[in-house]
Amino acid sequence: MAKGARDKIKLESTAGTGHFYTTTKNKRNMPEKMAIKKFDPVVRKHVEYKETKIK
């Protein structure tokens, strides 16, 4: 079986709350680390989430 182009990643909050989202990313089209603004329910605000590895 061929290995797929998409990797599972974890988007972790920069607010320091420990909240995270998981998603997939096409590693061929986006080799750089992803950063996106999403809602953090712990602080109840939109904050930046940065890509980290899933352990």
UniProtKB/Swiss-Prot annotation:
Taxonomic superkingdom: Bacteria
Pfam family, one: Ribosomal_L33
Gene Ontology MF: a single term: structural constituent of ribosome
Record flagged with keyword Lipid biosynthesis: no
Keywords: Ribonucleoprotein, Ribosomal protein
GO biological process, one term: translation
GO cellular component term of the entry, any: cytosolic large ribosomal subunit
Stated family: Belongs to the bacterial ribosomal protein bL33 family.
Protein name, entry field: Large ribosomal subunit protein bL33
Lineage, opening ranks: Bacteria, Pseudomonadati, Pseudomonadota, Betaproteobacteria, Burkholderiales
Gene this protein is translated from: rpmG
